[in-house]
């Protein structure tokens, strides 16, 4: 379809109305590329997809899609032989995750019959091996230790060397305390240094890396740690090389599937676009129209989507009707009616819903042409007439029986008598060629043409004679009156002048009386139609109420499980609260040793019930059944605390999992399933302690960022207790920089704790002064 009509009708602005409902960049790109088509099968497919998505929303009202970024360029780079960086891998990882979630959603979907949508869901590919490979990259853009054995080995050596550096520096902190401006280890240029008072700079041998702005502090790397620091620098280089090798290897593994992943991304975007169409339907009370095979148009209560508080109108353009001629004054909304018809057809032929009532029907046109000018002033010049006529001449050479033509103020801008004659001649030519046309005019001569000519119908915009204001209601079958005398009176023209003018025209008002009677009959018919629509609306409300009740019943199923969980959580909280009181009493007894208090706390926590008896809860049974592991599920390996993806199940019941570049064989008890990620996960107040296994597990870490001081100190106390119970040698505490209140609290706590051997800030690349590394006594 020609681009000019899309610009004239502002189709891009209409498409922008759907953008807020999109979740993916792929869907946004498909929306922007959307254009009308004359292929009936494509339009029918789009309509069927929207109807099926509506049915899906009835069963799953909160259906959503994981947001994804455009990856077409990434896949193209892969196909050209380039290696990807971490950010690009994260984009692919997100697409694979979105694809996996959609496949799981479709597999568990019940009570909905899908045909068109099923084709898209079933075309999504399954990549459990690649999912496992991409687990090597976490969402922060960091390559995990388990990505390869070599990377894990290098990082262990780095960790050990850094621990040695910290131990040496901690000893120096104690030995040289009087020479230091502050009793902490600082970091400068990636090296661990001591803040030495300038007066003692020659008392500590080493390399000077920085001097404070005041000159009072010199940051010295002691000679004892220089060699270790050089070893760490060398290991860091090895680490970078290994990370580069991992990127190359995973690029090679993903490369053969680049086209399939790109196709999955397109499907995700397509489903997102269909979802956005249905969300628009829900928001604007739009409908999916019926499709006519013979260019018949029936629009019920149709509105212009870009006009605020638009008046809804009915338009019927039957198969036996060639032209609709809208006559009447220029201020009644004729041009908007013209654009509403054209834009509704463009939207429908683009596979979009329309702003109309159910039962509306649209045709299929190969082209839609329009000559529409926004200028509606009676002071039109010859140049304006020439411009419009040039456009009309061009259109008349292109239109055929498969076109829809919209003509605004046909014949205007020249002598009224000649303009009216030209308008009738053009309409007659179009009628003989059987080209569907809607035209507006203020020439009264065309009223007679509409009455006397077959396959042509008059229409007008309603004018309220009581208020002398247009109502913008479309009156099909009724020619318009200019109401010039009434308007002139309203604007203040002398009644004498108006009366004199009325005597200048033919006093035979038979035609006007007939028009007036037709208007009255139309108004009466509209009242009856409005009553019928009120009944229909009541029926629709009843239908919506039933659907709402159905959805509420489904939600109650989910709520039942949540209530049971809350009940269990309350019991646990009560038990832990009682344990805290007992612990306070224990602390007051000086004869108890610290490790006995820790053990007592652990025993008390065991008293908290792990679960409430929900054996009779049907919702829980169903949820439990759904948690059975399957190929493609993301998991956490319990012994390592690392994430991976299940790739296959062995005959003996064990599972094969891809964890980064490492393939593992696991029993079901050796891993936990990872719940599907939500866009905004609910934050839970908890302290995570990961127990070491053979020194190969990740460091135990506590994140106190964003916590209140009292809350942070309580979590720190619990965290240290658990670490001691698990015989951990070292832990990390992330407190951030911020105002320094929590950092100071952590320092004071660690200074008081007799089980702490040493502590200091983390290396610059591991958090710097925003994190503290704690080493416990053996």
From Swiss-Prot:
Entry's transmembrane regions: none
List its EC numbers: 3.1.-.-, 3.6.4.-
Q: Return the InterPro entries for the record.
A: DNA_mismatch_repair_MutS_C, DNA_mismatch_repair_MutS_core, DNA_mismatch_repair_MutS_sf, MSSS, MutS, MutS2, P-loop_NTPase, Smr_dom
* DNA-binding listed as a keyword: yes
Q: Which PROSITE patterns match?
A: DNA_MISMATCH_REPAIR_2 (PS00486), SMR (PS50828)
Q: Recorded GO terms, molecular function?
A: ATP binding; ATP hydrolysis activity; ATP-dependent DNA damage sensor activity; endonuclease activity; mismatched DNA binding; ribosomal large subunit binding; rRNA binding
Q: Which GO terms describe its biological process?
A: mismatch repair; negative regulation of DNA recombination; rescue of stalled ribosome
Is Cytoplasm one of the keywords UniProt gives this record? no
- Domain of life, per the record? Bacteria
Q: Which residues form the Smr domain?
A: 702-777
Which PANTHER family is this protein grouped with?
Answer: OS10G0509000 PROTEIN-RELATED, SMR DOMAIN-CONTAINING PROTEIN
Q: What is this protein called?
A: Endonuclease MutS2
- Organism of derivation: Streptococcus pneumoniae (strain P1031)
What's the source species' lineage? Bacteria, Bacillati, Bacillota, Bacilli, Lactobacillales
Identify the gene encoding this protein. mutS2
């Amino acid at each position: 379809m020609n681009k000019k009509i899309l610009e004239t009708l502002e189709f891009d602005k209409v498409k922008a109305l759907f953008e807020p409902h999109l979740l993916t960049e792929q869907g946004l790109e498909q929306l922007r590329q959307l254009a009308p088509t004359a292929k009936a099968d494509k339009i029918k497919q789009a309509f069927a997809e929207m109807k099926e998505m509506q049915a899906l929303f009835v069963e799953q009202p909160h259906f959503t899609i994981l947001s994804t970024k455009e990856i077409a360029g990434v896949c193209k780079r892969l196909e050209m032989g380039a290696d990807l960086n971490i950010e690009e891998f994260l984009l692919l990882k997100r697409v694979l995750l979105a694809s996996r979630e959609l496949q799981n959603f479709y597999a568990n979907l019940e009570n909905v019959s899908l045909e068109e949508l099923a084709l898209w869901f079933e075309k999504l590919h399954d990549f459990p091996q690649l999912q496992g490979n991409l687990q090597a990259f976490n969402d922060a853009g960091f390559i995990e230790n388990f990505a390869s054995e070599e990377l894990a080995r290098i990082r262990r050596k780095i960790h050990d060397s850094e621990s040695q550096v910290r131990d040496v520096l901690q000893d120096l902190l104690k030995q040289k305390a009087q020479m230091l401006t502050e009793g902490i280890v600082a970091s400068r240029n990636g090296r661990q240094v001591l803040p030495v008072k300038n007066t003692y700079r020659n008392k500590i041998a080493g390399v000077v890396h920085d001097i404070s702005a005041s000159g009072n502090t010199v940051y010295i790397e002691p000679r004892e740690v220089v060699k270790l620091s050089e070893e760490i620098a060398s290991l860091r280089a090895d680490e970078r090389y290994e990370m580069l090798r991992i990127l190359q290897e995973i690029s090679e593994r993903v490369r053969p599937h680049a086209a399939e992943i790109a196709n999955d991304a397109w499907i995700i975007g397509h489903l997102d676009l269909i979802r956005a169409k249905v969300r628009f339907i829900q928001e604007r009370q739009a409908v999916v129209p019926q499709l006519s095979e013979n260019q018949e148009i029936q629009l019920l209560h149709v509105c212009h989507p870009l006009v605020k508080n638009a008046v809804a109108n009915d338009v019927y353009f039957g198969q036996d009707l060639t032209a609709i001629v809208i006559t009447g004054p220029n201020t009644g909304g004729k041009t908007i009616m013209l654009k509403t018809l054209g834009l509704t057809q463009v939207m429908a032929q683009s596979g979009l819903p329309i702003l109309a009532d159910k039962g509306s029907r649209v045709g299929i046109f190969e082209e839609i042409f329009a000559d529409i000018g926004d200028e509606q002033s009676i002071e039109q010049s010859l140049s304006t007439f020439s411009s419009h006529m040039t456009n009309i001449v061009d259109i008349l050479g292109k239109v055929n029986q498969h076109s829809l033509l919209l003509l605004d103020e046909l014949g205007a801008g020249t002598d009224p008598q000649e303009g009216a004659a030209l308008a009738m001649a053009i309409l007659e030519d179009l009628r003989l060629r059987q080209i569907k046309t809607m035209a507006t005019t203020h020439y009264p001569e065309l009223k007679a043409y509409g009455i006397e000519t077959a396959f042509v119908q008059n229409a007008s915009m309603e004018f309220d004679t009581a208020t002398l204001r247009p109502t913008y209601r479309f009156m099909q079958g009724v020619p318009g009156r200019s109401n010039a005398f009434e308007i002139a009176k309203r604007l203040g023209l002398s009644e004498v002048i108006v009366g004199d003018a009325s005597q200048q025209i033919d006093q035979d008002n038979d035609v006007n009386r007939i028009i007036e009677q037709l208007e009255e009959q139309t108004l009466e018919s509209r009242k009856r139609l409005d009553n019928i629509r009120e009944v229909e609306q009541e029926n629709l409300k009843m239908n919506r109420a039933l659907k709402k009740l159905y959805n509420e019943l489904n939600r109650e199923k989910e709520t039942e499980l949540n209530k049971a969980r809350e009940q269990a959580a309350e019991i646990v909280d009560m038990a832990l609260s009682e344990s805290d009181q007992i612990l306070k009493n224990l602390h007051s007894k000086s004869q108890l040793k610290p490790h006995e208090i820790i053990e007592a706390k652990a025993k008390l926590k065991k008293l908290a019930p792990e679960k409430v008896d929900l054996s009779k809860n049907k919702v829980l049974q169903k949820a439990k059944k759904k948690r059975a592991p399957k190929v493609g599920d993301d998991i956490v390996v319990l012994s390592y605390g690392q994430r991976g993806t299940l790739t296959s199940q062995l005959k003996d019941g064990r599972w094969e999992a891809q964890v980064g570049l490492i393939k593992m064989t696991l029993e079901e008890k050796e891993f936990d399933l990872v719940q599907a990620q939500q866009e905004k996960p609910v934050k839970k107040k908890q302290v995570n302690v990961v127990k070491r296994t053979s020194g190969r597990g990740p460091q135990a870490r506590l994140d106190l960022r964003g916590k209140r001081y009292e809350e942070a100190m309580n979590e720190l106390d619990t965290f240290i207790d658990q670490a001691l119970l698990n015989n951990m040698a070292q832990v990390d505490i992330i407190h951030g920089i911020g105002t320094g209140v929590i950092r100071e609290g952590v320092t004071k706590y660690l200074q008081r704790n007799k089980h702490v051997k040493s502590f200091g800030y983390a290396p610059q690349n591991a958090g710097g002064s925003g994190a503290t590394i704690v080493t416990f006594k053996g």
